[in-house]
Swiss-Prot record:
Pathway: Carbohydrate metabolism; pentose and glucuronate interconversion. Belongs to the mannonate dehydratase family. One of its GO terms (molecular function) is manganese ion binding. It catalyses: D-mannonate = 2-dehydro-3-deoxy-D-gluconate + H2O. This is Mannonate dehydratase. It is an enzyme of class 4 (lyase). It comes from Escherichia coli O157:H7. SUPFAM superfamilies: Xylose isomerase-like (SSF51658).
Length: 394
């Protein structure tokens, strides 16, 4: 695997020198300063590429070229935003950057309720608490009909939890959910959030798929023409939330994408931390089934709690994800490609890490502190080395 590291640009508290010392060779980044929907110019792409290469690294993957909400709702200037997206792909290809991670999650990107969940060893992790999320949705956001998405027990627990929250607890929970986590290009006030949810009141899963199909049919032929591989990131968590449909959550969703636009440019990011929160998924089977179309991997683990929809981000080699079998399946796919004469490695990043050691005293992007990811990258690197030596040393 190609060892990569997500970097949020010049304002990231983790420097490119840090990235190189961590042992990564590739950088995963994006032009976050360009508004959603606008074209990434060749000049801006080359400027960022030069910064990365001057540090002795390569820009391996774009994560992400964000998709304007008008495209998802099929309203407003969606045709112009699609045309802009096509041009951005052409410009990236012209600059030699050919793997693009993206997602089609409506309104919110990845979602957590607690950004400082303290683990038994004192380090901090990210957590999604189903009951706290229910309390937010029913008692703070007050979304009409929200009760239909929860069990009677969850509704009662959410009311009890809300009753014990201080004003600061409520404000913190609201910020965590709607203010925008790292990589999310949108943040909202509560009123703005309600208005954005309202835009989806008539959009169910079938309609969102229809809108996604329009996007794919416009984008994938351009990607194929210029040699760019699109790698869709799964929904996180991989299920409907807030009354919003989610359409990249299951194996069936993945197969739908392939059937809708059957091009090798239409591929996937295998995020084990997203798919892995569901006990009914076999990650190794997913990798084997869609291996030829996996162009990027996020490797981390999660731990489901008593409520199966509550989880926290575990250490990379612990939790519910069998990282050994996952890495083995990815390495096997790389060797399959090599046998076909394809020498390219699959970019891997350790995704999120725990906030630990000296990083506990620093301001960090949630999930993206340096030391926790350094640890995760080293652990996954060790797993891969052992697998390569044991099974592929010939």
């Amino acid at each position: 695997m190609e060892q990569t590291w997500r970097w949020y640009g010049p304002n990231d508290p983790v420097s490119l020198a840090d990235v190189r010392q961590a042992g990564a060779t590739g950088v995963v980044t994006a032009l976050h300063h360009i508004p959603n929907g606008e074209v990434w110019s060749v000049e801006e792409i080359l400027k960022r590429k030069a910064i990365v290469e001057d540090a002795g690294l390569v820009w391996s993957v774009v994560e992400s070229v964000p998709i304007h909400e008008d495209i998802k709702t099929h309203t407003g200037n969606y045709e112009q935003w699609i045309a802009n997206y096509q041009q951005t792909l052409r410009n990236l290809a012209q600059c030699g950057i050919r793997t693009v991670c993206y997602n089609f999650m409506p309104v919110l990107d990845w979602t957590r309720t607690d950004l400082e969940y303290v683990l038994p060893d004192g380090s901090k992790a990210l957590r999604f608490d189903q009951i706290e999320f229910a309390a937010f949705e029913m008692h703070i956001l007050k979304r009409p009909g929200a009760e239909a998405d929860y069990t009677e027990e969850e509704i009662a627990q959410a009311a009890e939890r809300f009753a014990t929250m201080s004003d600061e607890d409520k404000a913190r929970l609201t910020r965590n959910i709607i203010a925008g986590l790292p990589g999310a290009e949108e943040g909202y006030t509560l009123d703005q959030f309600r208005k954005h949810l309202e835009l989806y009141k008539d959009i169910d899963k079938a309609k969102l798929r229809e809108n996604f199909a329009v996007f794919l049919k416009a984008i994938i032929p351009v990607a194929e023409e210029v040699g760019v591989r699109m790698a869709v990131h799964p929904d996180d968590p991989p299920r409907p939330i807030l009354g919003l449909p989610r359409i990249v959550s299951t194996i069936e969703d993945m197969q739908w994408m392939v059937d809708t636009v059957n091009s090798m440019a239409n591929g996937f990011s295998m995020c084990t931390g997203s798919y892995g929160v569901r006990a009914d998924y076999d990650l190794v089977d997913m990798i084997k089934q869609f291996g030829p179309r996996i162009y990027f991997t996020h490797l981390r683990s999660t731990m489901r709690e008593d409520n199966p929809k509550t989880f926290h981000e575990a250490a990379h080699l612990n939790g519910d994800v069998d990282m050994y079998e996952v890495v083995k399946a990815i390495v096997e796919e790389e060797h399959r490609r090599k046998a076909e004469g394809k020498e390219d490695l699959i970019p891997m990043r350790p995704d999120h890490g725990h906030q630990m050691l000296d990083d506990l005293k620093k301001k960090t992007n949630p999930g993206y502190s340096a030391i926790g990811r350094l640890k995760g990258l080293a652990e996954v690197r060790g797993v891969e080395l052992a697998i390569q030596r044991a099974f592929f040393s010939h």
